[in-house]
Amino acid sequence: MLGLYLSSLFFAFFMAQVFATKYSITFTSDEYEEDETGQNEPGPLVFHLDKNSLPPALLNQMEFNPYLVLADLPEEPRAVDSQEHTDTVLASKSVIDFLLEDPLTIVEHKKFSQIESILHEIMEDSIQKKVGADEVFEEIPKPKIYAYEDILVTNMSIINNSEMPTSTATLTSTISYLSSTTSLALSTGVTSVEIFPTITPGNITTIGGYENSSSSLMPSMGILSFLFGLYLLLHP
């Protein structure tokens, strides 16, 4: 009864679609006639469809309905249901497991040499097609391999700094207001020397914490102070 109810429900929905889009169908209920025992044995509904009046999406839904039989369904690819998919996976897995148990049986099989020769022919044909098409392949440069040899370096002539001969020279520089004297020791073979002179102050006078090298600063300041005081006294 459940199957009949589902079939009737689907048929009602289908009829609504037909009235809406003008599909051409024929329905028969001969499959639901009571048998000799008086029991209503559920059976599928049979539809005769117009192949050009239904969209592919609706045909796909009707094809996989277990309570519908489409007598003249258009020739379309049929999808595999879940049970068929499970059976196929189990069968393929069992075959793979059987082959992996003893790989030598594959090589010794009489079909193996035939398959191998076919694969070789396919590879040769593909190579000939590439050569015939004059395809240019850029050759990848081969990596260069360098050989390295460990060489032990030994220094046979080591000179200590204490043994190097030295000479002492005194440099004296005289400037108008500075005098410096620097003594330095030069090692044999030295071409550059940094000189840090010792500066001796000359003619430097300290006034109020500031240094000035002029010896006539005090008289000048005295004269300026006297003139500034005289200006303050005479200015009204």
From Swiss-Prot:
GO CC terms on record? extracellular region; fungal-type cell wall; fungal-type vacuole; side of membrane; spore wall
Q: What domain of life does the UniProt record list for this protein's source? A: Eukaryota
* Residues of the propeptide: 213-236
The record places the lipid (GPI-anchor amidated asparagine) at N212
Please tell me where this protein is predominantly located. Answer: other
Keywords of this protein's UniProt record, alphabetized? Cell wall, Glycoprotein, GPI-anchor, Lipoprotein, Membrane, Secreted, Signal
Glycosylated residues: list them: N155, N160, N203, N212
Q: Record keywords: Calcium included?
A: no
Q: Does the keyword Secreted apply?
A: yes
Protein name per the record: Sorulation-regulated protein 2
Organism per entry = Saccharomyces cerevisiae (strain ATCC 204508 / S288c)
Q: What is the lineage of its organism?
A: Eukaryota, Fungi, Dikarya, Ascomycota, Saccharomycotina
Q: Which gene encodes it?
A: SPR2
